[in-house]
Amino acid sequence: MPKYRSATTTHGRNMAGARALWRATGMTDADFGKPIIAVVNSFTQFVPGHVHLRDLGKLVAEQIEAAGGVAKEFNTIAVDDGIAMGHGGMLYSLPSRELIADSVEYMVNAHCADAMVCISNCDKITPGMLMASLRLNIPVIFVSGGPMEAGKTKLSDQIIKLDLVDAMIQGADPKVSDSQSDQVERSACPTCGSCSGMFTANSMNCLTEALGLSQPGNGSLLATHADRKQLFLNAGKRIVELTKRYYEQNDESALPRNIASKAAFENAMTLDIAMGGSTNTVLHLLAAAQEAEIDFTMSDIDKLSRKVPQLCKVAPSTQKYHMEDVHRAGGVIGILGELDRAGLLNRDVKNVLGLTLPQTLEQYDVMLTQDDAVKNMFRAGPAGIRTTQAFSQDCRWDSLDDDRANGCIRSLEHAYSKDGGLAVLYGNFAENGCIVKTAGVDDSILKFTGPAKVYESQDDAVEAILGGKVVAGDVVVIRYEGPKGGPGMQEMLYPTSFLKSMGLGKACALITDGRFSGGTSGLSIGHVSPEAASGGSIGLIEDGDLIAIDIPNRGIQLQVSDAELAARREAQEARGDKAWTPKNRERQVSFALRAYASLATSADKGAVRDKSKLGG
Protein backbone atom coordinates (compact mmCIF):
# COMPACT_ATOMS: atom_id res chain seq x y z
CA MET A 1 0.00 0.00 0.00
CA PRO A 2 1.55 3.36 -0.99
CA LYS A 3 2.13 5.78 1.86
CA TYR A 4 0.69 9.27 1.67
CA ARG A 5 3.49 11.51 0.44
CA SER A 6 2.38 14.20 2.86
CA ALA A 7 3.03 11.91 5.84
CA THR A 8 6.70 12.77 5.37
CA THR A 9 5.95 16.25 6.73
CA THR A 10 3.01 15.52 9.04
CA HIS A 11 4.09 12.42 11.00
CA GLY A 12 6.86 11.69 13.46
CA ARG A 13 8.47 13.69 16.24
CA ASN A 14 11.32 14.76 13.98
CA MET A 15 8.81 16.63 11.80
CA ALA A 16 7.69 18.90 14.63
CA GLY A 17 9.08 21.90 12.76
CA ALA A 18 7.16 21.08 9.59
CA ARG A 19 3.95 20.55 11.56
CA ALA A 20 4.48 23.85 13.35
CA LEU A 21 4.61 25.55 9.97
CA TRP A 22 1.58 23.64 8.70
CA ARG A 23 -0.30 24.81 11.80
CA ALA A 24 0.61 28.38 10.88
CA THR A 25 -1.25 27.86 7.57
CA GLY A 26 -4.40 26.88 9.47
CA MET A 27 -4.03 23.11 9.77
CA THR A 28 -5.02 21.32 12.98
CA ASP A 29 -4.33 17.92 14.52
CA ALA A 30 -7.32 16.49 12.66
CA ASP A 31 -5.79 17.49 9.31
CA PHE A 32 -2.52 15.61 9.71
CA GLY A 33 -4.05 12.29 8.68
CA LYS A 34 -5.79 13.69 5.60
CA PRO A 35 -4.40 13.87 2.05
CA ILE A 36 -2.87 17.23 1.16
CA ILE A 37 -4.06 18.21 -2.30
CA ALA A 38 -2.43 21.00 -4.27
CA VAL A 39 -4.76 23.38 -6.08
CA VAL A 40 -2.54 24.54 -8.93
CA ASN A 41 -4.02 27.81 -10.10
CA SER A 42 -2.82 30.19 -12.82
CA PHE A 43 -4.75 33.38 -12.13
CA THR A 44 -3.27 36.55 -13.60
CA GLN A 45 -4.64 39.91 -14.65
CA PHE A 46 -2.41 39.87 -17.73
CA VAL A 47 -4.38 37.18 -19.59
CA PRO A 48 -8.11 37.20 -20.46
CA GLY A 49 -8.11 33.42 -20.29
CA HIS A 50 -6.98 33.62 -16.66
CA VAL A 51 -8.36 36.91 -15.38
CA HIS A 52 -11.42 35.16 -13.93
CA LEU A 53 -9.59 32.38 -12.09
CA ARG A 54 -8.81 34.24 -8.84
CA ASP A 55 -11.75 32.81 -6.86
CA LEU A 56 -11.98 29.46 -8.62
CA GLY A 57 -9.11 27.95 -6.66
CA LYS A 58 -11.02 28.73 -3.46
CA LEU A 59 -14.11 27.09 -4.97
CA VAL A 60 -12.17 23.87 -5.61
CA ALA A 61 -10.44 24.04 -2.23
CA GLU A 62 -13.77 24.24 -0.39
CA GLN A 63 -14.94 21.05 -2.09
CA ILE A 64 -11.68 19.27 -1.28
CA GLU A 65 -12.01 20.21 2.39
CA ALA A 66 -15.68 19.14 2.46
CA ALA A 67 -14.74 15.75 0.98
CA GLY A 68 -12.09 15.05 3.60
CA GLY A 69 -8.90 16.47 2.14
CA VAL A 70 -6.66 19.41 2.92
CA ALA A 71 -6.38 21.91 0.07
CA LYS A 72 -3.31 24.09 -0.47
CA GLU A 73 -3.35 26.52 -3.38
CA PHE A 74 -0.45 28.01 -5.29
CA ASN A 75 -0.12 29.86 -8.57
CA THR A 76 1.99 29.47 -11.70
CA ILE A 77 2.97 32.10 -14.24
CA ALA A 78 0.90 32.51 -17.41
CA VAL A 79 2.03 34.23 -20.62
CA ASP A 80 -0.55 35.66 -23.01
CA ASP A 81 0.71 34.69 -26.46
CA GLY A 82 -1.48 37.28 -28.15
CA ILE A 83 -0.08 40.16 -26.12
CA ALA A 84 3.46 38.77 -26.39
CA MET A 85 3.04 38.33 -30.16
CA GLY A 86 5.02 40.26 -32.75
CA HIS A 87 7.85 41.50 -30.53
CA GLY A 88 10.59 40.18 -28.25
CA GLY A 89 8.06 38.97 -25.72
CA MET A 90 7.26 35.97 -27.92
CA LEU A 91 10.74 34.57 -27.23
CA TYR A 92 9.51 33.79 -23.72
CA SER A 93 6.29 31.95 -24.55
CA LEU A 94 7.43 28.39 -25.23
CA PRO A 95 10.18 28.47 -22.57
CA SER A 96 7.47 29.39 -20.07
CA ARG A 97 6.02 25.91 -20.60
CA GLU A 98 9.15 24.37 -19.08
CA LEU A 99 9.12 26.90 -16.22
CA ILE A 100 5.50 26.05 -15.44
CA ALA A 101 6.20 22.31 -15.48
CA ASP A 102 9.23 22.75 -13.26
CA SER A 103 7.49 25.11 -10.84
CA VAL A 104 4.65 22.63 -10.35
CA GLU A 105 7.18 19.87 -9.72
CA TYR A 106 9.12 22.09 -7.31
CA MET A 107 6.07 23.08 -5.26
CA VAL A 108 4.46 19.65 -5.16
CA ASN A 109 7.65 17.76 -4.33
CA ALA A 110 9.01 20.36 -1.91
CA HIS A 111 5.81 20.18 0.14
CA CYS A 112 5.04 16.48 -0.46
CA ALA A 113 1.54 17.03 -1.83
CA ASP A 114 -0.46 13.88 -2.49
CA ALA A 115 -2.50 14.97 -5.52
CA MET A 116 -3.40 17.98 -7.65
CA VAL A 117 -6.24 19.86 -9.28
CA CYS A 118 -4.81 21.89 -12.16
CA ILE A 119 -6.71 25.07 -13.04
CA SER A 120 -5.28 26.01 -16.41
CA ASN A 121 -6.54 27.58 -19.62
CA CYS A 122 -4.21 29.25 -22.10
CA ASP A 123 -1.51 28.24 -24.53
CA LYS A 124 1.49 27.10 -22.47
CA ILE A 125 -0.20 26.70 -19.11
CA THR A 126 -2.21 23.57 -19.86
CA PRO A 127 0.78 21.86 -21.55
CA GLY A 128 3.14 22.85 -18.74
CA MET A 129 0.80 21.52 -16.08
CA LEU A 130 0.19 18.39 -18.16
CA MET A 131 3.92 17.73 -18.41
CA ALA A 132 4.29 18.17 -14.65
CA SER A 133 1.34 15.88 -13.91
CA LEU A 134 2.77 13.05 -15.98
CA ARG A 135 6.26 13.64 -14.57
CA LEU A 136 5.01 13.48 -10.97
CA ASN A 137 2.43 10.73 -11.61
CA ILE A 138 0.17 11.51 -8.66
CA PRO A 139 -3.64 11.74 -8.91
CA VAL A 140 -4.71 14.80 -10.89
CA ILE A 141 -7.78 16.39 -12.47
CA PHE A 142 -7.64 19.25 -14.96
CA VAL A 143 -10.34 21.89 -15.04
CA SER A 144 -9.70 24.83 -17.32
CA GLY A 145 -11.09 28.34 -17.29
CA GLY A 146 -13.10 27.76 -20.46
CA PRO A 147 -13.41 29.43 -23.87
CA MET A 148 -14.21 33.08 -24.54
CA GLU A 149 -17.47 33.94 -26.26
CA ALA A 150 -17.04 34.80 -29.93
CA GLY A 151 -17.07 38.49 -30.74
CA LYS A 152 -19.84 39.87 -32.89
CA THR A 153 -20.19 43.10 -34.82
CA LYS A 154 -22.23 44.58 -37.66
CA LEU A 155 -20.38 45.09 -40.93
CA SER A 156 -22.15 45.88 -44.22
CA ASP A 157 -25.56 45.42 -42.57
CA GLN A 158 -24.65 41.90 -41.49
CA ILE A 159 -23.81 40.55 -38.02
CA ILE A 160 -20.56 38.60 -38.24
CA LYS A 161 -18.59 36.59 -35.70
CA LEU A 162 -15.10 37.75 -34.80
CA ASP A 163 -12.02 36.69 -32.88
CA LEU A 164 -8.52 37.93 -32.13
CA VAL A 165 -7.18 37.02 -35.58
CA ASP A 166 -9.76 39.23 -37.30
CA ALA A 167 -8.51 42.20 -35.29
CA MET A 168 -4.92 41.45 -36.34
CA ILE A 169 -5.74 41.03 -40.03
CA GLN A 170 -7.95 44.10 -40.31
CA GLY A 171 -5.51 46.20 -38.30
CA ALA A 172 -2.83 45.64 -40.96
CA ASP A 173 -5.07 45.71 -44.05
CA PRO A 174 -4.51 49.02 -45.87
CA LYS A 175 -7.95 48.70 -47.49
CA VAL A 176 -9.74 48.72 -44.12
CA SER A 177 -10.72 52.10 -42.68
CA ASP A 178 -9.55 53.22 -39.26
CA SER A 179 -13.13 53.23 -38.00
CA GLN A 180 -13.81 49.66 -39.14
CA SER A 181 -10.51 48.42 -37.71
CA ASP A 182 -11.38 50.08 -34.40
CA GLN A 183 -14.85 48.54 -34.46
CA VAL A 184 -13.44 45.05 -34.99
CA GLU A 185 -10.76 45.54 -32.32
CA ARG A 186 -13.40 46.54 -29.77
CA SER A 187 -15.63 43.57 -30.62
CA ALA A 188 -13.15 40.72 -31.18
CA CYS A 189 -12.54 39.63 -27.57
CA PRO A 190 -15.69 40.37 -25.55
CA THR A 191 -15.33 38.21 -22.44
CA CYS A 192 -12.94 36.36 -20.18
CA GLY A 193 -11.81 32.96 -21.41
CA SER A 194 -9.40 31.49 -23.91
CA CYS A 195 -9.72 33.01 -27.41
CA SER A 196 -12.89 31.78 -29.05
CA GLY A 197 -11.59 29.69 -31.97
CA MET A 198 -9.89 26.31 -32.16
CA PHE A 199 -6.61 27.96 -31.25
CA THR A 200 -3.91 26.39 -29.07
CA ALA A 201 -5.55 26.98 -25.69
CA ASN A 202 -8.91 25.49 -26.62
CA SER A 203 -7.25 22.69 -28.58
CA MET A 204 -5.23 21.64 -25.53
CA ASN A 205 -8.21 21.86 -23.19
CA CYS A 206 -10.12 19.62 -25.58
CA LEU A 207 -7.23 17.17 -25.64
CA THR A 208 -7.22 16.82 -21.84
CA GLU A 209 -10.73 15.40 -22.25
CA ALA A 210 -9.52 12.88 -24.82
CA LEU A 211 -6.57 11.97 -22.60
CA GLY A 212 -9.06 11.26 -19.82
CA LEU A 213 -7.65 13.83 -17.40
CA SER A 214 -10.60 16.25 -17.41
CA GLN A 215 -14.37 15.99 -17.30
CA PRO A 216 -16.77 16.04 -20.26
CA GLY A 217 -17.44 19.63 -21.28
CA ASN A 218 -14.07 20.92 -20.10
CA GLY A 219 -12.86 21.89 -23.57
CA SER A 220 -15.96 23.65 -24.88
CA LEU A 221 -18.23 24.97 -22.10
CA LEU A 222 -17.95 28.77 -22.08
CA ALA A 223 -16.01 30.53 -19.32
CA THR A 224 -18.93 32.86 -18.70
CA HIS A 225 -21.61 30.19 -18.35
CA ALA A 226 -23.01 29.24 -14.96
CA ASP A 227 -22.88 25.54 -15.87
CA ARG A 228 -19.09 25.64 -15.86
CA LYS A 229 -19.09 26.10 -12.10
CA GLN A 230 -20.16 22.47 -11.72
CA LEU A 231 -16.92 21.28 -13.33
CA PHE A 232 -14.94 23.01 -10.58
CA LEU A 233 -17.19 21.66 -7.82
CA ASN A 234 -16.96 18.14 -9.22
CA ALA A 235 -13.18 18.35 -9.57
CA GLY A 236 -12.76 19.20 -5.88
CA LYS A 237 -14.89 16.26 -4.79
CA ARG A 238 -13.56 13.77 -7.30
CA ILE A 239 -9.86 14.40 -6.64
CA VAL A 240 -10.30 13.29 -3.02
CA GLU A 241 -11.90 10.06 -4.22
CA LEU A 242 -9.06 9.41 -6.68
CA THR A 243 -6.46 10.19 -4.03
CA LYS A 244 -7.94 7.79 -1.51
CA ARG A 245 -8.35 5.11 -4.15
CA TYR A 246 -4.64 5.22 -4.87
CA TYR A 247 -3.17 5.66 -1.38
CA GLU A 248 -5.72 3.68 0.65
CA GLN A 249 -6.75 1.00 -1.84
CA ASN A 250 -3.53 0.70 -3.87
CA ASP A 251 -5.53 1.36 -7.05
CA GLU A 252 -2.97 2.52 -9.61
CA SER A 253 -5.70 3.13 -12.20
CA ALA A 254 -6.18 6.48 -10.45
CA LEU A 255 -2.73 7.66 -11.58
CA PRO A 256 -2.38 9.92 -14.64
CA ARG A 257 0.09 7.66 -16.45
CA ASN A 258 -2.47 4.85 -16.31
CA ILE A 259 -5.27 7.11 -17.53
CA ALA A 260 -3.24 8.97 -20.18
CA SER A 261 -1.86 5.76 -21.69
CA LYS A 262 -0.45 5.42 -25.19
CA ALA A 263 -3.93 4.44 -26.34
CA ALA A 264 -5.26 7.67 -24.84
CA PHE A 265 -2.51 9.71 -26.53
CA GLU A 266 -3.49 8.14 -29.85
CA ASN A 267 -7.12 9.06 -29.18
CA ALA A 268 -6.12 12.62 -28.31
CA MET A 269 -4.13 13.00 -31.52
CA THR A 270 -6.98 11.45 -33.50
CA LEU A 271 -9.31 14.05 -32.01
CA ASP A 272 -6.83 16.81 -32.80
CA ILE A 273 -6.62 15.78 -36.45
CA ALA A 274 -10.40 15.41 -36.73
CA MET A 275 -11.12 18.84 -35.25
CA GLY A 276 -8.33 20.69 -37.08
CA GLY A 277 -6.62 21.71 -33.86
CA SER A 278 -3.60 23.95 -33.47
CA THR A 279 -0.25 22.67 -34.77
CA ASN A 280 1.16 23.54 -31.34
CA THR A 281 -0.69 20.56 -29.92
CA VAL A 282 1.75 18.29 -31.75
CA LEU A 283 4.62 19.96 -29.92
CA HIS A 284 2.88 19.65 -26.57
CA LEU A 285 1.65 16.07 -26.95
CA LEU A 286 5.15 14.95 -27.91
CA ALA A 287 6.54 16.70 -24.83
CA ALA A 288 3.86 15.28 -22.52
CA ALA A 289 4.39 11.75 -23.86
CA GLN A 290 8.06 11.96 -22.98
CA GLU A 291 7.19 12.97 -19.42
CA ALA A 292 4.88 9.94 -19.25
CA GLU A 293 7.66 7.74 -20.67
CA ILE A 294 5.39 6.79 -23.56
CA ASP A 295 6.83 5.98 -26.98
CA PHE A 296 4.70 8.40 -28.97
CA THR A 297 6.49 10.12 -31.85
CA MET A 298 6.07 12.05 -35.10
CA SER A 299 5.82 8.68 -36.82
CA ASP A 300 2.68 7.84 -34.82
CA ILE A 301 1.20 11.24 -35.67
CA ASP A 302 1.99 10.75 -39.36
CA LYS A 303 0.23 7.36 -39.40
CA LEU A 304 -2.87 8.79 -37.74
CA SER A 305 -2.97 11.82 -40.03
CA ARG A 306 -3.22 9.53 -43.06
CA LYS A 307 -6.42 7.80 -41.91
CA VAL A 308 -8.37 10.30 -39.80
CA PRO A 309 -10.85 12.59 -41.63
CA GLN A 310 -11.76 16.13 -40.65
CA LEU A 311 -15.10 16.04 -38.82
CA CYS A 312 -15.15 19.53 -37.34
CA LYS A 313 -14.13 22.91 -38.77
CA VAL A 314 -13.82 25.90 -36.45
CA ALA A 315 -12.22 29.36 -36.57
CA PRO A 316 -9.61 30.16 -37.79
CA SER A 317 -10.38 27.61 -40.54
CA THR A 318 -13.88 29.10 -40.93
CA GLN A 319 -15.68 32.08 -39.44
CA LYS A 320 -18.96 30.19 -39.28
CA TYR A 321 -18.15 28.24 -36.12
CA HIS A 322 -16.39 29.01 -32.83
CA MET A 323 -16.06 27.02 -29.60
CA GLU A 324 -19.56 27.97 -28.47
CA ASP A 325 -20.84 26.22 -31.62
CA VAL A 326 -18.70 23.14 -30.98
CA HIS A 327 -20.25 22.92 -27.52
CA ARG A 328 -23.77 23.21 -28.91
CA ALA A 329 -22.98 20.28 -31.22
CA GLY A 330 -21.85 18.10 -28.32
CA GLY A 331 -18.33 19.29 -27.62
CA VAL A 332 -15.34 16.98 -27.51
CA ILE A 333 -17.51 13.99 -26.66
CA GLY A 334 -19.60 14.69 -29.76
CA ILE A 335 -16.51 14.48 -31.96
CA LEU A 336 -15.25 11.39 -30.14
CA GLY A 337 -18.63 9.77 -30.68
CA GLU A 338 -18.39 10.20 -34.44
CA LEU A 339 -14.79 8.95 -34.42
CA ASP A 340 -15.84 5.92 -32.39
CA ARG A 341 -18.65 5.09 -34.81
CA ALA A 342 -16.06 5.33 -37.58
CA GLY A 343 -13.90 2.76 -35.76
CA LEU A 344 -11.02 5.21 -35.28
CA LEU A 345 -10.60 5.20 -31.50
CA ASN A 346 -9.06 2.94 -28.89
CA ARG A 347 -11.99 1.97 -26.67
CA ASP A 348 -10.01 0.43 -23.79
CA VAL A 349 -9.33 3.72 -22.02
CA LYS A 350 -10.76 5.37 -18.90
CA ASN A 351 -11.10 8.92 -17.64
CA VAL A 352 -10.89 10.61 -14.23
CA LEU A 353 -14.56 9.78 -13.65
CA GLY A 354 -13.66 6.09 -13.90
CA LEU A 355 -15.70 5.66 -17.09
CA THR A 356 -14.55 3.69 -20.11
CA LEU A 357 -14.86 5.34 -23.51
CA PRO A 358 -18.09 3.44 -24.36
CA GLN A 359 -19.56 4.41 -20.97
CA THR A 360 -18.56 8.04 -21.47
CA LEU A 361 -20.17 8.14 -24.90
CA GLU A 362 -23.35 6.46 -23.68
CA GLN A 363 -23.72 9.07 -20.96
CA TYR A 364 -22.37 12.24 -22.61
CA ASP A 365 -22.64 11.90 -26.42
CA VAL A 366 -25.63 14.03 -27.43
CA MET A 367 -26.39 11.57 -30.22
CA LEU A 368 -26.76 8.72 -27.70
CA THR A 369 -27.59 10.03 -24.24
CA GLN A 370 -31.04 9.84 -22.71
CA ASP A 371 -29.99 12.21 -19.93
CA ASP A 372 -31.82 15.53 -20.26
CA ALA A 373 -29.36 17.20 -17.87
CA VAL A 374 -26.49 16.39 -20.24
CA LYS A 375 -28.42 17.72 -23.22
CA ASN A 376 -29.22 20.85 -21.25
CA MET A 377 -25.53 21.34 -20.42
CA PHE A 378 -24.59 21.21 -24.09
CA ARG A 379 -27.22 23.87 -24.86
CA ALA A 380 -25.24 26.33 -22.71
CA GLY A 381 -24.57 29.31 -24.97
CA PRO A 382 -23.23 32.86 -25.11
CA ALA A 383 -24.88 35.94 -23.62
CA GLY A 384 -23.14 38.55 -25.75
CA ILE A 385 -22.35 40.74 -22.75
CA ARG A 386 -18.83 42.07 -22.13
CA THR A 387 -17.56 40.66 -18.83
CA THR A 388 -14.49 39.40 -16.99
CA GLN A 389 -16.57 37.30 -14.57
CA ALA A 390 -16.84 33.52 -14.58
CA PHE A 391 -20.29 31.89 -14.41
CA SER A 392 -21.97 35.26 -15.01
CA GLN A 393 -24.76 34.15 -17.37
CA ASP A 394 -27.04 31.20 -18.00
CA CYS A 395 -28.20 31.66 -21.61
CA ARG A 396 -29.05 28.56 -23.62
CA TRP A 397 -29.45 27.69 -27.25
CA ASP A 398 -33.03 26.81 -28.18
CA SER A 399 -31.82 23.47 -29.49
CA LEU A 400 -28.74 21.31 -29.90
CA ASP A 401 -26.87 21.13 -33.19
CA ASP A 402 -27.25 17.42 -33.93
CA ASP A 403 -27.10 17.83 -37.71
CA ARG A 404 -24.21 15.52 -38.57
CA ALA A 405 -24.63 16.15 -42.30
CA ASN A 406 -24.39 19.94 -42.38
CA GLY A 407 -23.71 21.05 -38.79
CA CYS A 408 -20.56 22.01 -36.93
CA ILE A 409 -19.60 18.39 -36.15
CA ARG A 410 -20.00 15.92 -39.01
CA SER A 411 -20.27 12.15 -39.27
CA LEU A 412 -17.73 10.15 -41.24
CA GLU A 413 -20.11 10.02 -44.21
CA HIS A 414 -20.36 13.82 -44.28
CA ALA A 415 -16.79 14.71 -43.29
CA TYR A 416 -15.43 18.12 -44.28
CA SER A 417 -12.60 16.21 -45.95
CA LYS A 418 -11.32 12.65 -45.99
CA ASP A 419 -7.92 13.98 -44.95
CA GLY A 420 -7.68 15.26 -41.40
CA GLY A 421 -6.92 18.77 -40.22
CA LEU A 422 -3.19 18.21 -39.56
CA ALA A 423 -0.48 16.56 -41.63
CA VAL A 424 3.20 15.68 -41.28
CA LEU A 425 5.37 16.44 -44.32
CA TYR A 426 8.86 15.10 -44.99
CA GLY A 427 11.53 16.16 -47.46
CA ASN A 428 15.16 17.03 -48.06
CA PHE A 429 15.12 20.01 -45.71
CA ALA A 430 12.64 18.51 -43.24
CA GLU A 431 14.19 15.11 -42.74
CA ASN A 432 12.56 14.72 -39.32
CA GLY A 433 9.30 16.23 -40.46
CA CYS A 434 7.28 19.43 -40.34
CA ILE A 435 3.63 20.21 -39.60
CA VAL A 436 0.87 21.90 -41.57
CA LYS A 437 -2.68 22.63 -40.45
CA THR A 438 -4.44 21.34 -43.54
CA ALA A 439 -7.79 22.43 -42.11
CA GLY A 440 -6.79 26.00 -42.89
CA VAL A 441 -5.32 25.42 -46.37
CA ASP A 442 -7.42 26.25 -49.41
CA ASP A 443 -7.85 23.31 -51.80
CA SER A 444 -6.30 25.35 -54.61
CA ILE A 445 -2.88 25.40 -52.91
CA LEU A 446 -2.60 21.88 -51.50
CA LYS A 447 0.14 21.53 -54.12
CA PHE A 448 2.35 24.59 -54.48
CA THR A 449 5.73 25.38 -56.02
CA GLY A 450 7.46 28.73 -55.81
CA PRO A 451 10.73 30.58 -55.31
CA ALA A 452 12.07 31.04 -51.80
CA LYS A 453 12.38 34.41 -50.13
CA VAL A 454 14.56 33.78 -47.10
CA TYR A 455 14.51 35.74 -43.85
CA GLU A 456 16.46 35.05 -40.68
CA SER A 457 13.97 36.64 -38.33
CA GLN A 458 10.24 37.09 -38.05
CA ASP A 459 10.75 40.86 -37.92
CA ASP A 460 12.50 40.97 -41.30
CA ALA A 461 9.77 38.82 -42.84
CA VAL A 462 7.01 41.08 -41.51
CA GLU A 463 8.79 44.17 -42.85
CA ALA A 464 9.11 42.53 -46.28
CA ILE A 465 5.47 41.41 -46.38
CA LEU A 466 4.07 44.79 -45.37
CA GLY A 467 6.59 46.53 -47.64
CA GLY A 468 5.34 44.70 -50.73
CA LYS A 469 8.53 42.70 -51.27
CA VAL A 470 6.64 39.40 -51.09
CA VAL A 471 4.48 38.72 -54.14
CA ALA A 472 2.04 36.07 -55.29
CA GLY A 473 3.75 32.73 -55.87
CA ASP A 474 6.53 33.26 -53.32
CA VAL A 475 7.50 30.82 -50.59
CA VAL A 476 8.48 32.83 -47.52
CA VAL A 477 11.13 31.01 -45.46
CA ILE A 478 11.73 32.19 -41.89
CA ARG A 479 14.58 30.35 -40.21
CA TYR A 480 16.67 30.50 -37.05
CA GLU A 481 13.40 30.84 -35.15
CA GLY A 482 13.35 27.30 -33.73
CA PRO A 483 13.60 26.34 -30.06
CA LYS A 484 17.38 26.82 -30.06
CA GLY A 485 17.77 29.36 -32.84
CA GLY A 486 15.19 31.92 -31.70
CA PRO A 487 15.56 31.00 -29.00
CA GLY A 488 12.06 30.09 -27.91
CA MET A 489 10.43 29.08 -31.20
CA GLN A 490 8.32 32.18 -31.79
CA GLU A 491 4.80 31.95 -33.20
CA MET A 492 4.41 33.40 -36.68
CA LEU A 493 0.84 34.68 -36.42
CA TYR A 494 1.73 38.18 -37.56
CA PRO A 495 3.48 37.08 -40.80
CA THR A 496 0.60 34.77 -41.72
CA SER A 497 -2.02 37.36 -40.77
CA PHE A 498 -0.21 40.07 -42.72
CA LEU A 499 -0.05 37.86 -45.82
CA LYS A 500 -3.85 37.84 -45.64
CA SER A 501 -3.91 41.58 -45.03
CA MET A 502 -1.94 42.05 -48.26
CA GLY A 503 -4.26 39.76 -50.23
CA LEU A 504 -1.73 36.91 -50.39
CA GLY A 505 -3.41 34.39 -48.09
CA LYS A 506 -4.10 31.96 -50.94
CA ALA A 507 -1.18 33.01 -53.14
CA CYS A 508 1.90 32.37 -50.98
CA ALA A 509 3.36 29.74 -48.68
CA LEU A 510 5.24 30.30 -45.44
CA ILE A 511 7.76 27.80 -44.08
CA THR A 512 9.60 28.06 -40.77
CA ASP A 513 11.51 26.17 -38.11
CA GLY A 514 9.46 28.27 -35.72
CA ARG A 515 5.84 27.58 -34.97
CA PHE A 516 2.41 29.06 -35.56
CA SER A 517 -0.34 30.36 -33.37
CA GLY A 518 -3.46 28.27 -33.20
CA GLY A 519 -5.00 31.27 -34.94
CA THR A 520 -2.96 30.68 -38.09
CA SER A 521 -4.47 29.39 -41.31
CA GLY A 522 -3.26 29.32 -44.91
CA LEU A 523 -0.34 27.38 -46.40
CA SER A 524 1.74 27.73 -43.25
CA ILE A 525 4.27 24.99 -42.59
CA GLY A 526 6.10 24.99 -39.27
CA HIS A 527 8.21 22.92 -36.91
CA VAL A 528 10.74 22.16 -39.67
CA SER A 529 13.14 19.66 -38.10
CA PRO A 530 16.05 19.68 -37.63
CA GLU A 531 15.98 23.44 -37.13
CA ALA A 532 18.57 25.69 -38.75
CA ALA A 533 20.45 26.29 -35.49
CA SER A 534 20.93 22.52 -35.14
CA GLY A 535 22.42 22.17 -38.61
CA GLY A 536 19.12 21.55 -40.38
CA SER A 537 19.02 21.90 -44.15
CA ILE A 538 16.50 24.75 -43.89
CA GLY A 539 19.65 26.75 -43.12
CA LEU A 540 20.94 26.01 -46.63
CA ILE A 541 18.02 27.49 -48.58
CA GLU A 542 18.88 30.56 -50.66
CA ASP A 543 16.71 33.24 -52.25
CA GLY A 544 15.23 32.03 -55.52
CA ASP A 545 15.51 28.30 -54.78
CA LEU A 546 12.37 26.50 -55.88
CA ILE A 547 10.43 24.73 -53.13
CA ALA A 548 7.72 22.19 -53.99
CA ILE A 549 4.98 21.45 -51.46
CA ASP A 550 2.73 18.41 -51.94
CA ILE A 551 0.34 18.02 -49.03
CA PRO A 552 -1.72 15.13 -50.50
CA ASN A 553 1.46 13.08 -50.84
CA ARG A 554 2.99 14.44 -47.61
CA GLY A 555 6.07 15.83 -49.35
CA ILE A 556 8.13 19.01 -49.23
CA GLN A 557 11.22 19.36 -51.40
CA LEU A 558 13.95 21.90 -52.02
CA GLN A 559 14.66 21.58 -55.75
CA VAL A 560 18.42 21.86 -55.43
CA SER A 561 20.86 19.05 -56.24
CA ASP A 562 22.48 17.00 -53.49
CA ALA A 563 25.88 18.17 -54.70
CA GLU A 564 24.91 21.82 -54.37
CA LEU A 565 23.46 21.24 -50.90
CA ALA A 566 26.67 19.47 -49.86
CA ALA A 567 28.72 22.44 -51.08
CA ARG A 568 26.50 24.86 -49.18
CA ARG A 569 26.82 22.76 -46.04
CA GLU A 570 30.59 22.77 -46.35
CA ALA A 571 30.57 26.56 -46.71
CA GLN A 572 28.32 26.87 -43.67
CA GLU A 573 30.60 24.69 -41.56
CA ALA A 574 33.57 26.80 -42.65
CA ARG A 575 32.09 29.71 -40.70
CA GLY A 576 33.45 28.09 -37.54
CA ASP A 577 31.74 29.21 -34.36
CA LYS A 578 29.41 31.34 -36.48
CA ALA A 579 28.14 28.29 -38.36
CA TRP A 580 24.39 27.72 -38.19
CA THR A 581 23.70 31.19 -36.83
CA PRO A 582 21.97 34.15 -38.54
CA LYS A 583 24.30 36.31 -40.61
CA ASN A 584 22.48 39.60 -40.20
CA ARG A 585 20.32 39.67 -37.11
CA GLU A 586 20.59 41.84 -34.04
CA ARG A 587 18.62 40.38 -31.17
CA GLN A 588 19.04 40.84 -27.45
CA VAL A 589 18.87 37.42 -25.81
CA SER A 590 18.80 37.27 -22.02
CA PHE A 591 20.75 34.81 -19.90
CA ALA A 592 17.50 32.99 -19.06
CA LEU A 593 16.74 32.45 -22.75
CA ARG A 594 20.32 31.40 -23.49
CA ALA A 595 20.05 28.81 -20.74
CA TYR A 596 16.86 27.49 -22.34
CA ALA A 597 18.48 27.39 -25.78
CA SER A 598 21.49 25.45 -24.50
CA LEU A 599 19.29 22.43 -23.74
CA ALA A 600 16.48 22.80 -26.31
CA THR A 601 15.75 20.06 -28.85
CA SER A 602 14.05 20.55 -32.21
CA ALA A 603 10.29 20.49 -32.65
CA ASP A 604 10.10 16.82 -33.67
CA LYS A 605 11.12 16.01 -30.08
CA GLY A 606 8.55 18.38 -28.62
CA ALA A 607 11.14 21.13 -28.07
CA VAL A 608 11.86 19.60 -24.67
CA ARG A 609 15.24 19.76 -22.97
CA ASP A 610 17.91 17.35 -24.12
CA LYS A 611 18.35 15.07 -21.12
CA SER A 612 21.52 13.57 -22.58
CA LYS A 613 23.25 16.89 -21.99
CA LEU A 614 22.50 16.50 -18.30
CA GLY A 615 23.60 12.90 -18.15
CA GLY A 616 20.01 11.68 -17.94
UniProtKB/Swiss-Prot annotation:
Residues modified as N6-carboxylysine: 124
Note accompanying the cofactor annotation: Binds 1 [2Fe-2S] cluster per subunit. This cluster acts as a Lewis acid cofactor.
Annotated binding of Mg(2+), by residue: 81, 123-124, 491
Catalytic activity line of the entry: (2R)-2,3-dihydroxy-3-methylbutanoate = 3-methyl-2-oxobutanoate + H2O; (2R,3R)-2,3-dihydroxy-3-methylpentanoate = (S)-3-methyl-2-oxopentanoate + H2O
GO BP annotations, alphabetical order: isoleucine biosynthetic process; L-valine biosynthetic process
GO CC, alphabetical: cytosol
Source species, domain of life: Bacteria
Claim: Transmembrane helix is one of the keywords in the record: no
Cofactor(s) named in the record: [2Fe-2S] cluster; Mg(2+)
Binding residues for [2Fe-2S] cluster: 122, 195
Example of a GO MF term: dihydroxy-acid dehydratase activity
One Pfam family per UniProt: ILVD_EDD_N
EC number, as in UniProt: 4.2.1.9
Function of the molecule: Functions in the biosynthesis of branched-chain amino acids. Catalyzes the dehydration of (2R,3R)-2,3-dihydroxy-3-methylpentanoate (2,3-dihydroxy-3-methylvalerate) into 2-oxo-3-methylpentanoate (2-oxo-3-methylvalerate) and of (2R)-2,3-dihydroxy-3-methylbutanoate (2,3-dihydroxyisovalerate) into 2-oxo-3-methylbutanoate (2-oxoisovalerate), the penultimate precursor to L-isoleucine and L-valine, respectively.
Family of the protein in this entry: Belongs to the IlvD/Edd family.
Family annotation (NCBIfam families): ilvD, PRK12448.1
Complexes and interactors: Homodimer.
Protein name (record): Dihydroxy-acid dehydratase
Organism: Escherichia coli O139:H28 (strain E24377A / ETEC)
Gene expressing this chain: ilvD
